[in-house]
């Protein structure tokens, strides 16, 4: 049953079901417990198994509040999909590396080369794929809507700087030689065309092929879909750019965590603490040391997630809630290393 919320935080809210105001105190309290952001306007409350409510923020962007159980199920599917495709990602990186090399030497086609560059930037710089609809509706940029004005070149490195999803500034430097050469040549070619035709290039899209056809998010996902058929364990599993970001987040988490632990182990050795640097909590001298050791592990987990969030241009809470597989965190805690 749909319930409409009317009013503002300052004036107070009223709720209507079938155009009749809800006055029952218990029912109103149940609605309040749903914790719908007071700043949302034109709120419709569904409270079904999937969606609690939806409304619009100050920029008139639709915001959906999903039911926690639905989010949990979707996350479980996402992480199970990732686990089932773990070998795929390794093979995909090899394929992308080959397509980059072929593109650079002229052995590959222009479209595949552009897509390989995009996927590399997703993995190395943490950018989202983006699409024209999101650019139009929210004035935000992703890789497929990247423009020449977002690029700066210096010392064989390219600085990419744009406003992405939810108004978050995305800044990253890429020093990959092939990526640098691809983007530098793209800018030079566009500038030459602009000079010849007296048109501006700053607002032109970077990733194009066949004389101006723009690479879309669908093109990149189709590339991944075809690769999925070849490399994934199951033909029913299709990897998308979202899956790529999830896999990248978890890979980065483990990499960062291991680096942090190595630093902590070296510090323990310098302090001359009892036991080897690799000793686990069960080897600690007493319960006090074990508790201190475990607190250190949780602190390092948090730090690793913060580093992943920064890499993916996300907040800590979003990264932990939507990107890092809880089973991986549990595994790290259980291993006590």
Which residues are covered by each model-predicted region?
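Compositionally biased low-complexity segments enriched in polar/charged residues
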Residues: 192-201, 266-290
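A positively charged, amphipathic N-terminal helix/segment that binds anionic biomolecules
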Residues: 1-142, 146-191, 200-247, 251-266, ...
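Catalytic-site neighborhood detector that most strongly recognizes the C-terminal catalytic loop/helix
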Residues: 291, 322-337
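The DNA-contacting recognition helix of HTH DNA-binding domains
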Residues: 315-316, 326
């Amino acid at each position: 049953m749909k319930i409409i919320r009317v009013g503002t935080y300052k004036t107070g809210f009223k709720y209507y079901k079938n155009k009749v105001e809800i006055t029952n105190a218990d029912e109103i309290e149940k609605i309040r417990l749903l914790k719908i952001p007071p700043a949302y306007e034109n709120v419709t409350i569904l409270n079904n198994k999937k969606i609690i409510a939806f409304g619009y923020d100050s920029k008139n962007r639709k915001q959906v509040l999903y039911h926690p159980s639905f989010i949990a199920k979707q996350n479980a599917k996402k992480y199970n999909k990732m686990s089932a495709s773990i070998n795929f990602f390794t093979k995909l990186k090899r394929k992308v590396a080959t397509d980059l090399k072929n593109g650079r030497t002229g052995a590959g086609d222009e479209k595949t080369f552009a897509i390989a560059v995009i996927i590399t930037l997703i993995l190395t710089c943490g950018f989202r794929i983006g699409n024209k609809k999101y650019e139009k509706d929210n004035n935000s940029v992703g890789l497929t809507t990247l423009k020449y004005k977002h690029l700066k070149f210096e010392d064989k490195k390219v600085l990419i700087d744009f406003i992405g999803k939810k108004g978050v500034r995305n800044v990253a430097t890429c020093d990959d030689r092939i990526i640098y050469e691809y983007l530098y040549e793209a800018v030079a070619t566009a500038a030459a065309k602009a000079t010849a035709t007296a048109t501006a290039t700053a607002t032109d899209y970077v990733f194009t092929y066949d004389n101006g056809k723009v690479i879309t998010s669908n093109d990149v996902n189709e590339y991944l879909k075809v690769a999925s058929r070849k490399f994934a364990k199951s033909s029913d599993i299709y990897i998308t750019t979202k899956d790529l970001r999830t896999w990248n987040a978890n890979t980065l988490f483990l990499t960062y965590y291991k680096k942090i632990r190595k630093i902590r182990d070296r510090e323990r050795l310098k302090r001359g603490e009892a036991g080897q640097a690799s000793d686990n909590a069960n080897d600690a001298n007493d319960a006090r040391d074990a508790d201190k050791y475990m607190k250190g592990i949780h602190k390092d987990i948090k730090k690793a997630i913060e580093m992943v969030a920064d890499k993916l241009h996300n907040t800590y809470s979003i990264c932990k809630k939507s990107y890092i597989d809880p089973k991986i965190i549990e595994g790290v805690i259980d291993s006590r290393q």
